[in-house]
């Protein structure tokens, strides 16, 4: 088990794993923090992340078993201790790890007597069994057991139809959920307008992913869901007091920031609030009054745009770009001779 003492940053938004352990081959636990957050942000992120962890991450499962010797699901086979239904339930519990897509075949070919476990499954090269000791069946007599299997990668639940028997083939209820459970909690600190929050996120997985891998996958899936909104273009809008149609671009500096969008740095910029930049109170208040709340909002404005803000001076612009050191990180052509 790994534990770290929690140290809270008062400046840059950051996340950290503060506890990590493997309780068994099929149960991993991780606890993470994200801070500092403004009031209300921790719940917003925590709720979305929990839903993504439980519903958006893909897993690999056995979805079908085939055998010509099986008349129906609740039948028994001489020499096997378990019923067919019990064997199917044991196959359902097998935890697999893979990056395959589509349906792939696997099989079990064993001669008794002896115990049949997960290590007896013959798998495609790209599929890994997390716990080879998982029990499947007990053969009491020297009989041959041949079962064909189908393996799929998906997400969420896949419920079998009521009539699932077809030519000795049985579909299996699949739970494509590497994350067993996820919880979030919020800790507030500070006073008055300075109040901030820490998000605590707890993740339990089945061993096919570590909690850190699950957090990364859920975050990426959430980003992918929101990217269409970032690339959308607002064609036009109507003013209430007249019928003039005005076409405005959604973002300024579209061409200059094309590369930035490609590598998703835009997402990071929208997560950095000007509250975290340690700006002078006067500059901070001027930006807030102009609806500039994040670093992304700030980068949409040229030097000339900033100078149009009431009570803003050239020294204030210099101060902002001095803090950001923007010329080292972003290609934005600002007139240097005015500094």
From Swiss-Prot:
Keyword Cell membrane among record annotations: no
Catalytic function, reaction form: RNA(n) + a ribonucleoside 5'-triphosphate = RNA(n+1) + diphosphate
Record InterPro entries: DNA-dir_RNA_pol_insert, DNA-dir_RNA_pol_RpoA/D/Rpb3, DNA-dir_RpoA, RBP11-like, RNAP_asu_C, RNApol_insert_sf
Localization terms from the record: Plastid, Chloroplast
First-tier enzyme category under EC: transferase
GO cellular component, one term: DNA-directed RNA polymerase complex
Domain of life: Eukaryota
Molecular function via GO: DNA binding; DNA-directed RNA polymerase activity; protein dimerization activity
UniProt free text on domains: The N-terminal domain is essential for RNAP assembly and basal transcription, whereas the C-terminal domain is involved in interaction with transcriptional regulators and with upstream promoter elements.
Designated name of the protein: DNA-directed RNA polymerase subunit alpha
Species this protein is from: Populus alba (White poplar)
């Amino acid at each position: 088990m790994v534990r770290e003492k929690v140290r809270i940053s008062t400046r840059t938004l950051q996340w950290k794993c503060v506890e990590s352990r493997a309780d068994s081959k099929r149960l991993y636990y991780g606890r993470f923090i994200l801070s500092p957050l403004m009031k209300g942000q921790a719940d917003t992120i925590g709720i979305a992340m929990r839903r993504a962890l439980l519903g958006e991450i893909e897993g690999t499962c056995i979805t079908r078993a085939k055998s010509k010797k099986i008349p129906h699901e609740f039948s028994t086979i001489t020499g096997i201790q378990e019923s067919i239904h019990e064997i199917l339930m044991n196959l359902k519990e097998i935890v697999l790890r893979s990056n395959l897509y589509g349906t792939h075949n696997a099989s079990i070919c064993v001669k008794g007597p002896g115990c049949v476990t997960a290590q007896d499954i013959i798998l495609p090269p790209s599929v890994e069994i997390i716990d080879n000791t998982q029990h499947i069946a007990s053969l009491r007599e020297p009989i041959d057991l041949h079962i064909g299997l189908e393996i799929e990668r998906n997400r969420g639940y896949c419920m079998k139809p009521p009539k699932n028997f077809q030519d000795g083939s049985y579909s299996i209820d699949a739970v494509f959920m590497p994350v067993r459970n996820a919880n979030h909690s919020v800790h507030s600190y500070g006073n008055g307008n300075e109040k901030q929050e820490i998000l605590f996120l707890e993740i339990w997985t089945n061993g096919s992913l570590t909690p850190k891998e699950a957090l990364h996958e859920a975050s990426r899936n959430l980003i992918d869901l929101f990217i269409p909104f970032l690339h959308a273009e607002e064609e036009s809008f109507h003013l209430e007091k007249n019928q003039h149609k005005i076409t405005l671009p959604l973002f300024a500096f579209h061409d200059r920031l094309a590369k930035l969008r490609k590598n998703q740095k835009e997402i990071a910029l929208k997560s950095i609030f000007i509250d975290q930049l340690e700006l002078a109170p006067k500059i901070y208040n001027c930006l807030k009054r102009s609806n500039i709340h994040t670093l992304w909002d700030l980068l949409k404005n040229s030097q000339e745009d900033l100078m149009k803000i009431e009570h803003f001076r050239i020294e204030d612009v210099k101060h902002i770009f001095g803090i950001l050191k923007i010329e080292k990180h972003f290609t934005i052509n600002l007139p240097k001779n005015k500094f």
